[in-house]
Amino acid sequence: MPLNRVREAIEAIKKGEMIIMMDDEDRENEGDLVYAAAFSTPEKVNFMVSEAKGLVCVCVTSTCSDRLGLAPMVRENNSQHETAFTVSIDARECSTGISAFERDLTIRKMVDGTSKPEDFVRPGHIFPLIAKEGGVLVRTGHTEGSVDICKLAGVAPVAVICEIIKKDGHMARRDDLMEFAKEHHLKIVYISDLIEYRMQNEMLILIKERSEVEFLGKRAERYVFQDHHRREHTLYAFGKIIDNSLVKYHTVGKDLSLLESEKKYSTLMQAIKKIQEENGLIIFMDTPQNAAPQIKDFGIGAQMLRFLGIKNFRLLTSEENREYVGLSGFGLNVTEKIVLQGGPIQL
């Protein structure tokens, strides 16, 4: 069923049709209208504005963003999902830029491979979003999902998306979206579907090293993985790896923030002690300096667990309300969340 949904969505995108994209089939989530920018028309833009009512955005690759000179909207992105907005733009030929016709003009110029930065003015009425390299296998967002579906359809990887809002002004949820799809004859695809579809043939990690080591006084199996950016991530497994193991992810920066914060240090030490006691796994994820961990940016760590044959796991976390979208697409399931409270600890 998930793979059939992806195939149907791909065919719809190829034909220039709109689809609805949601996170997971079994979650109460929001949805976006999506279509390939290569097939943009004023009528499609007007449908988004009048029927979906959300913000019309255009999702692009980093290559396209660089070519068009799209600078980040803010220097420090502290939004909940760290959505990669750039400065808004209009095509230079636009007057106000807000009509469906002029927004369509801007969209079509964005997908035109000959367009240059000077062909646009800033700010404007189209909001570009930059998809992460690696797509939904790295970040499970609608930005990445919409670009991925365009790539899978064999069209230019530029997608137009818009959140769907109900007539009463609230966000449309699963049942509302199902009704919307039925009313307008639209296909539905989930981020988790795309992950599962791509995982049939793709893997963004490789294992570089496996060895027996001593980790803070206890024997462990160490696995070193390399991702598509050539960053290395290290996993320590204490005892035999079994299904429903206790797992902790820890983001490793290149600075000394861990030593500068007693709370961060204590929380990590508490996590290590609990993982060792329960023969679990701790994964140290390498990230660029000063890059904050993103809520949806966990695909590489998910692939590491899948590589080791884990399907179900208990998650040790310091963020009780953090959501992990699309896990089912990786063949993973969090059976329990155990929340850490940082504080003094004796090892």
Swiss-Prot record:
Cofactor: Mg(2+); Mn(2+)
Binding sites annotated in the UniProt record for Mg(2+) 2: 28, 142
Gene Ontology CC entries for this record: cytosol
Listed name of the protein: 3,4-dihydroxy-2-butanone 4-phosphate synthase
Biological function: Catalyzes the conversion of D-ribulose 5-phosphate to formate and 3,4-dihydroxy-2-butanone 4-phosphate.
Chain segments carrying region DHBP synthase: 1-200
Positions annotated to bind Mg(2+) 1: 28
Encoding gene (name): ribB
InterPro entries, sorted: DHBP_synth_RibB-like_a/b_dom (IPR017945), DHBP_synthase_RibB (IPR000422), GTP_cyclohydro_II (IPR032677), RibA-like_sf (IPR036144)
GO molecular function, one term: manganese ion binding
Span list, region GTP cyclohydrolase II-like: 201-347
Cofactor, how bound (note): Binds 2 divalent metal cations per subunit. Magnesium or manganese.
EC number: 4.1.99.12
